[in-house]
């Protein structure tokens, strides 16, 4: 034995081990602390689904998209630059305001699931970096200057300010999960849909492909939050139904205002009809999320019709005709974003 290591410090289960910063082991820990056993089959299924559908930014080649950027009008280019500036920053928005929720749980299924979610969020961040550079013709200096100007745009600030205010007044763990559901399930919905409309013009095909993959990942993340809210917050009082409906209504109003305020006024990609369909989709998404947490719909919004570009994103193994690589998604989680 190395004389520099005391016998007490060699046993990670020794409750008498000492050392600066050492966390005491509970006197009567549950046996599951020391080995894996499945305790959350629904969350374990989502982890397995995430692993089965792992992907990397290196699998996507954006050369054709770089050529398509010149086909966008000035208003369209500005709009999509704005959306991707928001989406790129949104992961930090979630982490800064609602991070650490995984630390509330001892079930290894939940902890293991969050590891997978964090891994794929890294891929999303890297993909958004690539897409931003594509939209700026690989001019990183111009991209940086644009993001610095845009990150405090009123349309983005209203989302940030709303979230920060709701977090400050939030006094329960279940309500924080409602906020997480709304960020990933409502605050991204209009952006994902607007990006998907590029497909209808056969533009930025790989960007559309990555949007499909990211949207499907976020559908899994939102479903996981709903499952945790439903099944694994015992001992925590859930917010009253009126409070939940109020939060949903506020989030939907903000998201619809976000897309209305930024959409180009003269676009062959986003017609008035397309914008109306996106707004309906935001309401439909909210209703679906309410259903996942066993609540009645707020809007009774109809499902998007077959022409809606995100209709290709159900997880029934649809493959986009325009895509070089199939974005078929194994499993049965329905995209509700």
Curated annotation (Swiss-Prot):
Cofactor annotation: Fe cation
GO BP: deoxyribonucleotide biosynthetic process; DNA replication; release from viral latency
UniProt-listed InterPro entries: Ferritin-like_SF, HSV_RIR2, RNR-like, RNR_small, RNR_small_AS, RNR_small_fam
Kinase among keywords: no
Molecular function terms, GO-annotated: metal ion binding; ribonucleoside-diphosphate reductase activity, thioredoxin disulfide as acceptor
Active site: 128
Entry binding sites for Fe cation 2: 121, 184, 218, 221
Residues annotated to bind Fe cation 1: 91, 121, 124
Predominant subcellular localization, coarse grouping: host cell
Keywords on record: DNA replication, Host membrane, Iron, Membrane, Metal-binding, Oxidoreductase, Transmembrane, Transmembrane helix, Viral latency, Viral reactivation from latency
Subunit structure, as described in the record: Heterotetramer composed of a homodimer of the large subunit (R1) and a homodimer of the small subunit (R2). Larger multisubunit protein complex are also active, composed of (R1)n(R2)n.
Job description of the protein: Ribonucleoside-diphosphate reductase holoenzyme provides the precursors necessary for viral DNA synthesis. Allows virus growth in non-dividing cells, as well as reactivation from latency in infected hosts. Catalyzes the biosynthesis of deoxyribonucleotides from the corresponding ribonucleotides.
Family: Belongs to the ribonucleoside diphosphate reductase small chain family.
Protein name: Ribonucleoside-diphosphate reductase small subunit
Protein's organism: Human herpesvirus 2 (strain HG52)
